[in-house]
Amino acid sequence: MIEVGETMGELPTNKIVFCERSWKTPVSILAFLIFVTFAWGIYLLDHYDEDDNFHGADDLSVGQFLVRNIAMPHVQRLYHTVPPAVVGVGGGGVNAGPVASGAIVGTNGYVITTLHSVSKLPEISVQVATTGGIRRFPAQVVKTIPGHDLALLKMQTTEKFLHFRMADVQTVVPGQQVFAFGRNMAGAPLVRQGLVQSADAPLAVGATQITHLLRSDAVYSWEQTGGPLVNAQGDLVGINIAATGPTGKVEGFTVPAQVIVSHLQDVVRFKKGSATAPGQPQTQTVAAGSTNWWSKARAVVGGPTAIPGMGMNVVQGNVVKGNVAPSIPSGMPFIDTDHVGGAKIGGYSVADIVGLVMLALAAGVTGGMMTMGGGVLQVAGMMVFFGYGMYLIRPVVFLTNVVVYGAASLRNDKAQLVQWDKVKPLIPWGIAGVILGYFIGNAIGDSVVGILLGLFALIMAGKAVMEILQPNAGEETAESISATEAEDEMDELMALADGTSRPKASGLALPEGHARSAVLGLPMGLFSGILGISGGVIEVPLQRYVGRISLQNAIANSSVLVFWASVAGSVVAFLHGSSTGLIHWEAPVTLALVMIPGAYVGGIIGARLMRVLPVRVLKGVYAATMAAIALKMLTSV
């Protein structure tokens, strides 16, 4: 009997050959090769390019790349080179298809499309054909031109893109050969060749009369709306608008390049295409072997044909005969004196500079007279009259406030009106509020901000009207009102205009601590960040009735708080805008430099008007201004 653990005799000799050989080295080599294979596969998938023809072309315009790419026949090169600069514009949903086309006009990702296509979209995305396939980028409105149905978008990215140069207006003549591009619902590019039919054509869109348009038969589908019309050099002749004519057929219009440059060169530094004398033929010899390609590209008007290997639908509106591309017919060039010529300073016309200065002056006067409302007027004016988006407005207003309220803080500190022991605990809350408000404002979008701004102005107008209707709101000037007669902050401000009255503090008492500091500092920052206003209209009443201090001290303390909140807002707006590719520092800094002098001078004028004009007149002007802002902002939604 064998018990557990016992063995009978000697164990047999190990005859397994594998265990007698060295196996670790080959297995290690095999494992390493497998790892390298998988790593290489992952790298290839990550760096896969559907079309490597455009490597190194990020900083080039279409025209520049077209000259460099000479391997294909001339028109085939055009059809192959233009589509990467043509984008689809749609909503922000994952499965949202394009509602219009667009054209990339700046290497940093600026896109021009039609305003009516994006005005009602809560979110905007841009679909771009890259070497790695179609990519989707979120975008924001930078500026709008309602009179020409244009919207300038900025993709939220710091990447570089192939883009268009702007065609020289002198080369645009009736009969000129052009190509209208777009992207269809599937994101595939489409193009039709045609001719410029007429210049300076009008188009009525609802109640808006659009002028200075080109007519072209190259536009045949709504999918080309917002897309580029280009010439044979690949330069942007204009942005397409597809309209339904009286017969129900699509009629093609184009907002020409000189209109685009005139209205948007304050934000984008456009590249200019090479000029060709009008009436001179542009002969391009087509390379040998292109006959077969043209036989594939030709199609009946209205029936696009896909070009094998190019993924593009081409409609041949005017068939090219022979081996030579058509020349430009002789004719009078399109001269647009309304948008071409004139002095430009930093990309701004003299008229635009005067308009911006006058807006800043009016905002300064309003703020100087009533110590509130100036920021509301500045933001609303930049949105309505100049079409700027909040991404550009906020850093401009913040920079303006830094200078204007910085100077006011120094004056108030010199007059010993700033209560530093009360202000210092509020500064962190004001900074936190403006940062939080900035991101909230970005999240809700410009349309919601416009509504909030209109409602805010409406409330301020109603408040002023109620005070006008009070029995004691007569025709007195600031000097004739005593502090005891001043029952609200507006009347009290008039009593303080001569600097002699010091009203008794009154209001709601809150215990000292973080909660009190938050109540006094956070709301001002939130309103400033969301709406882009200074926030003084919120802070002064809070300082007065919650802080229980006199109006003089409330105004002085508020100026310091607005200054530091604006400094923080400027830093956040520039850092966030630059890191996400939304803004570049040149545009907001230039705008601020234009507007700061007007705002500063306007504040001085407004302070003097407060001392000499009757109270009823001051309140009436203020109420009318706020009511006009509310009406415009709420009806333009």
Curated annotation (Swiss-Prot):
UniProt topological domain (Lumenal) ranges: 46-352, 400-416, 460-517, 576-586
Region (TSUP-like): 370-637
UniProt subcellular location: Magnetosome membrane
Residues bound to a divalent metal cation: H148, H263
Domain of life: Bacteria
Membrane topology: Multi-pass membrane protein
Phenotype seen when the gene is deleted: Cells have no magnetic response but still make empty magnetosome membranes; magnetosome proteins MamA and MamE localize normally. Deletion of genes mamH to mamV (amb0961 to amb0978) gives cells with no magnetosomes and no magnetic response.
Function: Plays 2 roles; promotes magnetite nucleation/formation and activates the MamE protease. Despite its near conservation of a protease-like sequence, this is probably not a protease. Required in conjunction with MamP for proteolysis of at least MamE, itself and MamP. May transport a solute that controls MamE's protease activity. May place individual iron atoms into the magnetite lattice.
NCBIfam families: MamO
Name this protein carries in UniProt: Probable membrane transporter protein MamO
Organism: Paramagnetospirillum magneticum (strain ATCC 700264 / AMB-1) (Magnetospirillum magneticum)
